[in-house]
């Protein structure tokens, strides 16, 4: 039996498998976004690397959110959300929105157009506004499917990336 075949047949303890699973996915480079919404009249949101396009007809995206997060109870079908694709210069914003925060903790964050149904962050590489169409519970997270209502791409910029549990920027094309 080859070593690879032996590895496939060996049972791995659940905690070891969970740790290895997280380690494998930490190597998948992802763009960094902040999903935002109004909580009353205040900006609220969270950092997400799980944002992806789903469909062109209809225009649909998804993101995932932990059910234990402060944001999860604020989201529901029909709610408006904004998705801002961050630049490498916006790392501090990513860190801020990645941790639990007190109500009103983002009052000083620049919003591109506060009159919108969904807030969008100033200086981002791209903006998408969307309406939540469906929330599908899956384990300890929920998959949130959204119908896109608007999209805007900045003229240029350097994206913020997350890989191997740290931030990176895109320095050159290969």
Residue ranges: model-predicted function:
Residues 2-174:
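Basic, polyanion-binding surface patches
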């Amino acid at each position: 039996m080859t070593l690879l075949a032996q590895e496939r047949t060996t049972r791995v303890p659940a905690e070891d498998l969970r740790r290895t699973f997280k380690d494998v996915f930490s190597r998948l480079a992802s763009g960094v976004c902040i999903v935002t919404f109004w909580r009353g009249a205040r900006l609220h949101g969270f950092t997400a690397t799980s944002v992806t396009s789903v469909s062109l007809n209809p225009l649909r995206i998804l993101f995932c959110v932990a059910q234990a997060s402060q944001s999860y109870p604020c989201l529901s079908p029909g709610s408006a959300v904004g998705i801002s694709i961050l630049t490498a210069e916006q790392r501090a914003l990513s860190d801020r929105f990645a941790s639990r925060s007190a109500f009103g903790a983002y009052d000083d964050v620049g919003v591109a157009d506060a009159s919108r149904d969904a807030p969008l962050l100033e200086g981002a590489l791209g903006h998408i506004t969307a309406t939540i169409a469906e929330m599908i519970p899956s384990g300890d997270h929920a998959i949130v499917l959204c119908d896109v209502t608007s999209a805007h791409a900045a003229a240029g910029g350097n994206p913020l990336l997350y890989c191997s549990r740290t931030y990176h920027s895109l320095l050159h094309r290969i």
